[in-house]
């Protein structure tokens, strides 16, 4: 009981601290074994930039099933536990397909910064998916920065199109 109370207090303090810093900068991240090493590099990069990161697994390079981690991150985004999500597997394909099964999730598989910028600006994507076997670490970090730093345009045409997806 006591440890649960401390955990709840810690979560509340963290939430208040984030709100005082200008909003929820909590990023949820998950990967399968194929994306584990890149995920570790992304976490380090994000923390150095001041983001709070919640790691939903996996926690080693031991073979595992990507849908478990895709669903965990997607549900955290959907429920507002984290602001945005990042998912990494070998190609980014399976993990993005899985995330997009969750209502309200717009996961975009990006292998370049142009796509990362466009999907945030036009589609208001809330999860970035990448393939660790497709992009190297340097490009991946550039993609992550572009995705997180690009705001949704709020143009009427983009809102209309997103609403058509949600219906």
Tell me the role of every PLM-derived stretch.
Residues 41-51:
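A short, Lys/Arg-enriched amphipathic alpha-helix followed by its capping loop at the start of a domain
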Residues 27-42:
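N-terminal beta1-alpha1 ligand-phosphate binding loop
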